Amino acid sequence: MTQIKINGVSYDVKEGATILDTINQHDIPHPQICHVPAVDPIETCDTCIVEVNGQLVRSCSTKAVDGMDVYLTSDKAKAAQTEAMDRLLENHLLYCTVCDNNNGNCALHNTAELMEIEHQKYPYKPKVEPHEVDMSHPFYRYDPNQCIACGQCVEVCQNLQVNETLSLDWEAERPRVIWDTGVAINDSSCVSCGQCVTVCPCNALMEKSMLGEAGFMTGLKQDMLDPMIHLIKEVEPGYSGIFAVSEVEAAMRSKRTKKTKTVCTFCGVGCSFEVWTKGRKILKVQPSDGPVNAISTCVKGKFGWDFINSDERITKPLIRKNEEFVESSWDEALDLIASKLGGIQQQYGPGSVGFISSSKITNEENYLIQKMARQLFETNDVDNCSRYCQSPATDGLLRTVGMGGDAGTIQDIAKAGLVIIVGANPAEGHPVLATRVKRAHKLHGQKLIVADIRKHEMAERSDIFMRPKQGTDQVWLMAVTKYMIDQGWHDEAFIRENVLHFSDFTQVLEKYTLDYAQEMTGISKETLIQVAEMIRDADGTCVLWGMGVTQNTGGSYTSAAISNLLLATGNYRRPGAGAYPLRGHNNVQGACDMGTLPNLLPGYQKVTDDEARAKFEKAYGVPIQSQPGRNNMQMLDAIMEGKMKAMYLVGEDMALVDCNANHVDEVLSQLDFFVVQDCFLSRTAQYADVILPAAPSLEKEGTFTNTERRVQRLYQALPTLGESKADWEILQEVARRLGADWHYNHPSDIFDEMASLSPLFSQANYDVLEGWGSFCWGSHDGKDTPLLYEDGFNFPDKKARFALNDWVQPVEFEAQYDCLINNGRMLEHFHEGNLTNKSKGIQSKVPEIFVEVSPELAKERGIADGALLRLVSPYGALKLNALVTDRVQGNELFLPMNSVSKDSAINFLTGPAADVNTSTPAYKQTKVRVEVLKAKGKSPLPRTNPRYKKRHPQNGVEVQRKWNRPGYVHLTTTNERE
């Protein structure tokens, strides 16, 4: 064991640790203003300097070597640290008591106090005039006059988030942070992730929502505030007593500022963070210790919470009376629901009432929905929105490796030698996950292959970008697999020991030659060989895929083809490898885990399994149907056939997200009784007979499960708004009125019941999940399992199976429908935008919907930016403004999903075609004809949107440029980089 001495005391050192790592490991107080553990040493502040064997070195970048004698507070070290701090304070006013950042976590303030700074050696000099403080961005501001040029914001922007917008202008007379080439923040390539604001150690970068709100005296008008600042700044840096005053004020703030750990309610990455609130005001989101994201966020998680306090929230139960919604009491609404649903069940029997669950609500609430369906209505007719997106991926994995979840964690993706992204755009759909790929690719030599019909950010960054014809991914995947087997590049030992049906599989592959693949996909043979070589040479391959794969007629077969390729090359059962279907919603994984599926009970136990069913029958006190129920699509058919009379839908906008939305409108209108539980009057809710006001995630407790299979707790940050209630409380009230003996006092009671019935979760509970704790399901003994299949695949014989599927060709359209219309997420919005469209800041970046048109098609049809187009499919028509961009090519169009309008929402164009195995709609197989109604107009995307801007990559903060400044005097005696 390596040991070093610190101030004469011996300490153990972890392998590869720096001196500062060791100092922090043992909780020794030491200055370190520019230190960010998530990135490499920045080396800009010099406050961490220590003395080692008579030499002054930066502890953040100096490796701890056995036998080192380190002094933190020797005269030499202390003098260097103090000089470093004085250089920083020359750029900053310490007026802490009236500062918005005086919240106990200001690194500059805390370090000045730790170092017992009494006087400022160099007088403060402002860099710019007050009016030059950059207030242009909707979410945060930058004050150069408070910036100490530590570079943390630059380092995380360049090398952690890898958005590559920020840099430090070291050549300026007074160095400062700049955006792109020095433009206003709102005119830059900034994607509003907020990472720079999160790491800023002072008040140079601040959330606008904090300004004037955080402190007791920070909300004063400027003419009153300025004199106070001048008074404070005259005395505070030189008097430790005044620091004490500011700490008293900070302590007072903490009494009224509530800090609550939560889990993000948007995508499936599962970021967790603290949300700071004052009353109902959301002051800021502060990530720190999340097991998934650490200090990272995206624009939605950091700034997209305006919907919580939206005036559009439903706050009282609504009952349809005379074709109008009328506010009612909870008793009236619940009694009506119990009477109507109970009556329909009694009259028509099982199968007359269907249940649609939600990927937005908690695990506990999803569990109760399936329990209500099976216990009280004797039906397996329960489903969730995974049917619209991820069911094919789950199907492909269940048939090949036995479990329908990610093979490992996001850390495994970052470790992989090669990442292949197929039909997914994680930079916009799963932004924080994408940062880990971008960082590994930029800094650690990871290779990246992207297969997509649209050129998005990850495609631009890739080593190989392939644009296959729509719906042909299975062909190139099988061709690459065949080629690798033919070349002897497959992992024979792995296959022999772990996989069945290899001989049959090679026969299925026979026709998938490189020539055939080139003809069917449009990808050259040379490119496919390069892909095969890259897989061969990689130290671990991870494949990530999304709706560009799953939302096709052959989505489940293509998902299986991905798994087949990984099995053939031995890329399972080890870190840094495996299959990673990217779950779209915050809890779509959890909704499936909890059994809101027609064929599966909680914990993926089959309804056809007599033993599993008997267990639930004993717990629920009723027989469980032994045949799978209807899925979402089949329920709609049953409504049209008059077999299903009522539906209970929670937190889902079926009228927008289902395919062929015009048909869905007609179907929902046929229901005898329809209950919708939601926060907003969604399009689907407009068909309801009763609408129950539900609470969003910040107003309740429970758990979410992310794309890694990771379960995390969320805590209640705000009281419920008006008379709204948590979904689990509403469900319990309904169940009791229907005669159920439900007595849950807290979501933990529900979780414990679920875990007692589900072996995958048997060792999970709220104590395990307390605080920042988490649990990854994946083992039948219920233990935490970050990496799947270490003990074999999830079949009785522990062996995987090659799936034996041929390619399913895409749907054909009449010749008049000559343009393929693709669809997907935008970074700023989440899915249909029901939540994010409540944010003024987000709307300022993306104020309206549009359709992307290629330059080639624009030239051919005479289309310019802003042109008004009518898109007509066999199932409907939309009117949209055009955005001409090379992100699409030829006769391909792209329509963002974030619309709730019948004039612009994609599903008023999509048709009934579906995946062969799972009924998932083939949204991606939609063609239209384009009619030009107006040849040009105003661009639908503001010029302030970062998509117009160019990124400015560099290797972090580039501290050498600081050291090369004329007159710069080094404080260290040795430094390998100087």
Question: What residues fall within each predicted segment?
Answer:
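Catalytic alpha/large subunits of respiratory electron-transfer oxidoreductases
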Residues: 93, 198, 229, 236, ...
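Long, low-complexity segments enriched in small/aliphatic residues
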Residues: 582, 589-598, 749-841, 969-971
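Short beta-alpha connecting loops at secondary-structure transitions
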Residues: 5, 66-72, 179-182, 460-468, ...
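Short acidic-glycine loop/turn motifs at beta-strand connectors
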Residues: 53, 65, 276-281, 873-874
